Amino acid sequence: MNRWVMSYLALALRREGFAVQTLSYRTMRGTLAEHLARVAERIAALEAPRLHLVGHSLGGVIALRYLQRRADPRVRRAVLLGSPVAGCRAAADLARSSGGELLLGGSLGVWREPVDVSVDPRFEVGAIAGTVAFGLGRMVTRLPKPNDGVVCLDETKFPALRDHLALPVGHTLMLASPQIARQTAAFLRNGEFRR
């Protein structure tokens, strides 16, 4: 995913007082191990006493895996936006379809790995799920509701979450949602979403 996709959210978080760095990754080319290595390298180079992570879709899965495998001790909180951390029906069905493996590329391994949703309690993780079924996943498979058009609500939940919030947005449009930006900032500040 090109980091420019996160431009609106990055700007909104800057306006909330956060220093923001964005990272591009090649969804179709890079493997999970390659993405994790880049994230670790980028985080290690940052000069800040405290760090938070925000990831959308596969980016949230990468953030969670980072927390599980090699997290910098400065990382405190993470917000996962529309991230299928408990599996992804749309990706699994796409992988089984003709040409699906080619479309998923390097991310295919993420969806074939056993799901591990454990996370060290020192990290506070929040997740936001969309409930407006508008996205490419609907073209691949029939998703149970509620979903955001790509990821089902239940695919965004796991026991170690500190907080979970469902909002009326679609998968891609959540990156341009003022409500998502405000809730992300609230969790990064306080470890919980605003109700």
Model regions and ranges:
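Serine-dependent carboxylesterase/thioesterase catalytic core
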Residues: M1-Y8, A12-L23, G30-R122, L143, ...
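Histidine-bearing beta->alpha loop at or near hydrolase active sites
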Residues: Y25-G30, P168-T172
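C-terminal catalytic-base region of ester-bond hydrolases, centering on the histidine
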Residues: D120-R195
